């Protein structure tokens, strides 16, 4: 019969085996011995369930099925980091540090793990709770799933009560194996290890999380000062003595030159790591100096994340296809041999225009380098000419539209070729897609595939036809059931009440963007007033230049446009501005009256367009860059150089929550 002393001894033995294997990568026993000890432990726990504690190694295998994830408030906010993209950004950061605390500084440089930020709470040395970062103030309780990560100790080497921060991630090998299994089972593949790690930690079945072989690196304590250390580097060393896994590749740098060398080294070596990194984190090493620097609403002023340049990958250019946009612009698109770039498979990429293809001498059949601009949009950088075999074909832009065969023209001062046939089917189709989009009429359920079906089956020929669609016709479309058709018709009906600026933007008048549409709607109040306006009147309005004014006058001079507007009126589409008028609002309501506001970073609750609309409704003008003329910067998470520049210029910083306080009571924008 087992005694409790043996049970506790087994827990300590298995914890040590796990530490040796998962934390310091120095296994001391064979798998068979580990398994034998684990089986002995499980038998004891089966006989004595009253002895089982949350720290038992048996709890790492999962098995618990969760009902959901509770919200967890972080006692100390989990701030995000401002970004640097080049040496100039890093030099600016360094100068701000030196201006504040002097030249006696050092930076701890660490690899920026591409995973999921988490916090671990230990009470008297025992693992108590784990949570996601969330919005930095409130995260989700993922205690059970984090317990399945073998490199997280259930007990520290000392009985500290601390909150530790780190990055949970999926090693490359585990990611590859997971996707191989999912492919065999016909499941959707994960785009990258980061997404796989995040998805694994949000599994309600902890057995699934346990099977994913996640790992972690710890990089901070909520307050290192509580541990009696004076530097960040000493704090990391102490975490290691507690049995926590800290990345070994960190380096203390005493100058920017040493920082640059560290970055260059890991830019070259990153591919050889067993896990993904997407940059380097710099932290002012002295904790007292960190306190002097302080923090902004979203990020510490004493730390910054250098982001690696976009990944560049070679592949074969199979063909060049031409796309016709809603304004008739002909855009060449590269058809590529599929290749993975920055975590996703890319088979098409932008070539922008004919001049760029000629300038870069890009030929069909070339091996080309591609990257994702801003790690989002694939584009062709250049041809690798030394790999040419002689069979490659130079590309020549056709003289006629690939859709309607009309002659293409190049307008004055433009690099793009255009189809100027107003009846071009491709332009009409793209115009319809634009009309229903979120920034325009915002008709839910009318995605690109539905529009293409409606257009190809001749159920719509222009935007007015959308408002006369019948339930019977919609039910004939592929994948359109009773419920989806009912919802779509309700969305179409609701869109009729949109304010005038939404309709104006949706009509796709050349040069008229969402901002100009809003200015026009506010100034003229009705479509009838606008359509008779002359150039002089138009150019007297803010945001309306001569080129745009000419375009507006030309648009409304077209008899077909008059017919279209009459059809829209007949359908009951609103043609009046119904948004707030600045002159009707009090000074207190117009918090941004006459001010220039810049949005930066990722917003958690508002879309960028909603935030922009809210700022404009409060009298502000939204700008894309920070300067001395900027009055306010609204900063979301992961704000980069714009936030840093705003701080340097002492421009007031608002958080997203500050902005949300000014939402209308009805709780929505552009309803």
From Swiss-Prot:
The active site is at residue 112. Pfam families: BRCT, DNA_ligase_aden, DNA_ligase_OB, DNA_ligase_ZBD, HHH_2, HHH_5. GO terms for molecular function: DNA binding; DNA ligase (NAD+) activity; metal ion binding. Its cofactor is Mg(2+); Mn(2+). Zn(2+) binds at residues 401, 404, 419, 424. It comes from the Bacteria. Gene3D superfamilies: 5' to 3' exonuclease, C-terminal subdomain (1.10.150.20), 6.20.10.30, BRCT domain (3.40.50.10190), DNA ligase/mRNA capping enzyme (3.30.470.30), Helix hairpin bin (1.10.287.610), Nucleic acid-binding proteins (2.40.50.140). NAD(+) binds at residues 31-35, 80-81, 110, 133, 167, 283, 307. Belongs to the NAD-dependent DNA ligase family. LigA subfamily. NCBIfam families: dnlj, PRK07956.1. This is DNA ligase.
């Amino acid at each position: 019969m087992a005694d409790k002393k043996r049970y506790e001894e087994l827990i300590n033995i298995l914890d040590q085996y796990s530490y040796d294997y998962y934390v310091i990568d120095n296994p001391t026993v064979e798998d068979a011995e580990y398994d034998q000890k684990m089986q002995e432990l499980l038998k004891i726990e089966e006989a004595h369930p009253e002895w089982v504690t949350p720290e038992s190694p048996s709890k790492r295998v999962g098995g618990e099925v969760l009902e959901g994830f509770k919200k967890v408030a972080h006692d100390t906010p989990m701030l995000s980091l401002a970004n640097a993209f080049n040496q100039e950004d890093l030099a600016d950061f360094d100068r701000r540090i030196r201006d504040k605390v002097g030249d006696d500084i050092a930076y701890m440089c660490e690899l920026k793990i591409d995973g999921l930020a988490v916090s671990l709470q230990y009470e008297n040395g025992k693992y108590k709770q784990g949570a996601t970062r969330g919005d930095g103030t409130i995260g989700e309780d993922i205690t059970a799933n984090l317990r399945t990560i073998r490199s997280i100790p259930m007990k520290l080497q000392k009985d500290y009560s601390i909150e530790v921060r780190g990055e949970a991630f999926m090693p490359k090998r585990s990611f590859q194996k997971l996707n191989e299994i999912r492919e065999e089972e016909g499941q959707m593949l994960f785009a990258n290890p980061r997404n796989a790690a995040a998805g694994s930690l949000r599994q309600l079945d902890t057995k699934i999380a346990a099977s994913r072989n996640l790992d972690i690196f710890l990089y901070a304590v909520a307050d290192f000062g509580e541990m009696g250390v004076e530097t960040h580097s000493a704090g990391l060393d102490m975490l290691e003595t507690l049995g926590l896994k800290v990345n070994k590749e960190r380096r203390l740098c005493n100058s920017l030159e040493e920082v640059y060398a560290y970055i260059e080294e890991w830019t070259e070596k990153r591919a050889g790591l067993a896990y993904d990194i997407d940059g380097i984190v710099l932290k002012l090493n002295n904790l007292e100096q960190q306190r002097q620097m302080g923090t902004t609403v979203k990020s510490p002023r004493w730390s910054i994340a250098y982001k690696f340049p976009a990944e560049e990958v070679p592949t074969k250019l199979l063909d060049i296809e031409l796309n016709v946009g809603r304004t008739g612009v002909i855009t060449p698109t590269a058809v590529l041999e599929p290749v993975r770039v920055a975590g996703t498979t890319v088979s098409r990429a932008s070539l922008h225009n004919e001049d760029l293809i000629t300038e870069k001498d890009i030929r069909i059949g070339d091996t080309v380098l591609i990257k994702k601009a801003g790690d989002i949009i694939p584009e062709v950088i250049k041809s690798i000419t030394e790999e040419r075999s002689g069979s490659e074909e130079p590309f020549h832009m056709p003289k006629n539209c690939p859709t309607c065969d009309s002659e293409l023209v190049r307008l004055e001062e433009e690099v793009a070729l255009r189809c100027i046939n107003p009846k071009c089917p491709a332009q009409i189709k793209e115009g319809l897609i634009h009309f229903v989009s979120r920034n325009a009429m915002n008709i839910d359920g009318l995605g690109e595939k539905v529009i293409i079906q409606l257009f190809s089956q001749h159920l719509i020929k222009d935007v007015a036809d959308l408002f006369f669609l019948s339930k019977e016709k919609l039910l004939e479309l592929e994948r359109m059931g009773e419920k989806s058709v009912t919802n779509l018709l309700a969305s179409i009906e609701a869109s009729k009440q949109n304010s005038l600026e939404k309709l104006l933007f949706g009509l796709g008048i050349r040069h008229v963007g969402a901002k100009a549409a809003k200015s026009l709607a506010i100034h003229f109040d009705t479509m009838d007033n606008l359509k008779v306006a002359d150039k002089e009147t138009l150019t007297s309005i803010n945001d309306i230049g001569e080129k745009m004014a000419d375009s507006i006058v030309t648009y409304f001079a077209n008899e077909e446009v008059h017919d279209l507007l009459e059809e829209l009126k007949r359908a009951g589409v609103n043609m009046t501005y119904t948004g707030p008028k600045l002159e009707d609002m009090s000074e207190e309501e117009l918090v941004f009256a006459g001010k220039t506001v810049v949005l930066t970073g990722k917003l958690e609750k508002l879309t960028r367009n909603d935030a922009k609309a809210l700022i404009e409704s409060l009298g502000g003008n939204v700008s894309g860059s920070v300067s001395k003329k900027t009055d306010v910067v609204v900063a979301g998470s992961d704000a980069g150089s714009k936030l840093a520049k705003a701080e340097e210029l002492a421009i007031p910083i608002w958080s997203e929550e500050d902005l949300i306080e000014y939402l209308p009571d009805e709780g929505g924008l552009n309803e």
